[in-house]
Amino acid sequence: DVYKRQQKNSVLVIEGIHALNPELTSMIEDCYKYRIYVSVLTSISLDNHNWIPTTDNRLLRRIIRDYRFRGYSARDTIARWPSVRRGEDKWIFPYQENADAMFNSAMLYELAALRKEAEPILGEVRECDPENAEAYRLLRFLRYFNYIPDVGLPGTSLLREFLGGGSFRY
């Protein structure tokens, strides 16, 4: 219905994790679509043999965002992560190749900037929690990176979506 009310030569932006799903935009002809896929595509390694998994970047972002803005603990987010991954495999990744353009939102300094925020959140996971092994693994992983103070990050940085202090209001 929104599409039918659009003015001639206007732009309709559909944003979100399901925006590339063809069922969502079936009423719009493909020739009128320009699809952009934005994702963390980590391209750095710890050494010649150990690449940083994209999922670690994404999980750390989510742990921080869920804690700061949704009131979830790291334990809660880690416990939900397998379900999130199954949902991605079913509803997001199959459609990423439909994109006309891909944007890699990973930044070389990201893990150093996230470390200061992530460590105390991950440290709240108790040893007796089943999620402790994953929290401990992430804490050890973060030790590879020096801290970068977030005060130097501009308000328009994508990392502000997770760390807070951004220029945009959601």
Functional labels for PLM-detected ranges:
Residues 6-7, 30:
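A generic fold-level signal
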Residues 8-12, 34:
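Loop/turn-to-beta-strand initiation segments
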Residues 13-14, 103:
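N-terminal Rossmann-like NAD(P) cofactor-binding module of classical short-chain dehydrogenase/reductase
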Residues 17-20:
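Short beta->alpha connector loops
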Residues 22-170:
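Conserved NTP phosphate-binding and transfer environment spanning the P-loop NTPase/kinase superfamily
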